Amino acid sequence: MSGRGKGGKARAKAKSRSSRAGLQFPVGRVHRFLRKGNYAERVGAGAPVYLAAVMEYLAAEILELAGNAARDNKKTRINPRHLQLAIRNDEELNKLLSGVTIAQGGVLPNIQAVLLPKKTAKAAK
């Protein structure tokens, strides 16, 4: 006795909206946050999928650049300094996150041109 009545079909295995969209970020959780956040009275079915995809893309982009920064510094672990270097050296990410302060991120190395030693004719020879 399965409780499905006469000739009822077995229910298909549940598949998350994240896996249907081919995403790692949780679509269901994003949908819940959109509903609970009082952003709008109603939330469409596609909105959380799109938002989760955008957030996943941005996270992947930042982690890729931060991983490169860590490798350049001969480190195997990404730390806040690597995130800072990755974001500030990328023009578009820097513009997007211009108002963001990363704790323990430090600053970009920069020396004003007027402070550098002057090149003389003797030094050139």
Swiss-Prot record:
Q: What does UniProt give as GO cellular component?
A: nucleosome; nucleus
Source organism superkingdom: Eukaryota
The subcellular localization recorded is:
Nucleus; Chromosome
Xref: Pfam families: Histone, Histone_H2A_C
Q: Which InterPro entries match?
A: Histone-fold (IPR009072), Histone_H2A (IPR002119), Histone_H2A/H2B/H3 (IPR007125), Histone_H2A_C (IPR032454), Histone_H2A_CS (IPR032458)
Q: Which Gene3D superfamilies match?
A: Histone, subunit A
Please state the protein's primary subcellular location. Answer: nucleus
N5-methylglutamine occurs at which residues? Answer: Q104
* Gene Ontology terms, MF aspect: DNA binding; protein heterodimerization activity; structural constituent of chromatin
Q: Which residues are reported to carry the modification N-acetylserine? A: S2
**Residue numbers spanned by region Disordered:** 1-21
Q: Which UniProt keywords apply?
A: Acetylation, Chromosome, DNA-binding, Methylation, Nucleosome core, Nucleus, Phosphoprotein
Query: What residue ranges are annotated as transmembrane?
Result: none
Q: Where Phosphoserine occurs along the chain?
A: S2
Bias (Basic residues) occurs at: 1-18
> So what family is this one in?
Belongs to the histone H2A family.
What this chain does, per the entry, is described as:
Core component of nucleosome. Nucleosomes wrap and compact DNA into chromatin, limiting DNA accessibility to the cellular machineries which require DNA as a template. Histones thereby play a central role in transcription regulation, DNA repair, DNA replication and chromosomal stability. DNA accessibility is regulated via a complex set of post-translational modifications of histones, also called histone code, and nucleosome remodeling.
Assembly and interactions?
The nucleosome is a histone octamer containing two molecules each of H2A, H2B, H3 and H4 assembled in one H3-H4 heterotetramer and two H2A-H2B heterodimers. The octamer wraps approximately 147 bp of DNA.
Q: What is this protein called?
A: Histone H2A
Query: What species does this protein belong to?
Result: Asterias rubens (Common European starfish)
